[in-house]
Amino acid sequence: MKRMIVRMTLPLLIVCLAFSSFSASARAASEEKYWDHWIERHAQPLDASNASNKDLRFLKKVLKGKRIVQLGETTHGAGEINATKVRMIKYLHEELGYDVLAFESGFPDTNASYLNMDQLTPKSTMKNSIYAVWHTEDVVELFDYMKEQKEKGDPLILTGFDIQSMKNSFNVAATQWVKAVDPEKAELLSQSENDFSTLVTDSNTFDEFSQKKEKLVKNYQKLIKFTKTHASELKENLPKEPKAYEMFMHSLQLRIDVMETYMLEEMKEKLEEYPENIEDFSFFMRDRMMAEQFQWVADTLYPKKKIIVWGHNYHLRKQNTKMIKDWVQLNGPNMGDYLPERLKKQTYTIGIYAYSGASLDSSDNKTVKPVTSPPPSGSLEALLKAADRPAVFVDFLHTKNKKGTSWMYTPRTALYWGYMEEQMILKEQYDGVIWLEHITPSVIIK
């Protein structure tokens, strides 16, 4: 009897599934003709040659009620992406009152460099604070602007939220501050910073790592105790900036936290000892800790400030675990997943993508990675070509699902670093996107 039922129902099921699939495809095809028309009418042109920035006025309406604006990027190594973001940052600061810029770079490095900005050239501040992939003329212009704004009394404050650091950047600045109070403690700090930077790379066994780590943790605990007991003297010698003492203390504690969690996992993975749960890999742990750092910046360091975030699309998008397919094909949690809902509600997240061109590979800042061109049919990059402009912005957050916008609400391909296919529902990952027709590799300056 069961076999008879199967024989009778299986053909019917196949027909139903086939019809359902055909209907969905037919419906999508019928809606596609409306997509181009909607994009032509509603994609906001961006004109870098417009000195008055009239083309950016739409941001006042789009960002209403949003305390945090996240500016993503499909690749770290493209000049046009950097230039677009720098221009938007200036507008956001001058016209909409965003006064903090948080980079995807080390918290200790960015804050120490900002505190010492008065003593450094814009180029030196840039090199001491953010990763080398952004050491370009476009970004020097941003740091020049930050220095000017600080001198005018309307600062655009630099900070960071990453747990990875650059050797010597925080070390040089912090050692000078401590040396004025206690030269011996300054030497302890300098040596600890040097040992911290090589803790994983110079350890060959887990026991060796553990012994070095325990010694370093004790060193930083001594430095934290010293900082607390000599708070008034240190504050006299720290740069005369609000929160300088809090930044210094947090940087010291962060060193301990990173050693006890992220570096511990890095060492295990170096020895090919892998965790059972995907979120415990150092790759995903970094995003969790970046979310924690950003939360501290937003809630404790600058609780009343409006904040701009500069980072990669991957880290900033809303919820990587809801991706259909991400670039590593694991859909593990990203920084956006880990942020608390109350901060997410205050945030407008912008992804940036490119139609053609090339960018640098950030692994060496030399290798050129071409953008897949033409992009896949039906992809985000391909669809926004219909705007027939060199650069456009499209708002997702305030756009309802209808015939002309269904592409935002249905599975869509977009390219990571311009050449690796990811699949997502755009509305779930971004509040808006910037599309650039062409990008070129960044020129890294020495």
Curated annotation (Swiss-Prot):
CDD domains membership: Ere-like
Alphabetical list of InterPro entries matching this protein: Emycin_Estase, Hydrolase/PRTase-associated
An example Gene Ontology biological process: response to antibiotic
A Pfam family reported for this protein in Swiss-Prot or TrEMBL: Erythro_esteras
Keywords: Hydrolase, Signal
MF terms (GO), sorted A to Z: hydrolase activity
Signal peptide: 1-28
Gene3D superfamilies: Biosynthetic Protein domain (1.20.1440.30), EreA-like (biosynthetic domain) (3.40.1660.10), EreA-like, domain 2 (3.30.1870.10)
EC number: 3.-.-.-
Enzyme class: hydrolase
Protein name stated in the entry: Putative hydrolase YbfO
Species classification: Bacteria, Bacillati, Bacillota, Bacilli, Bacillales
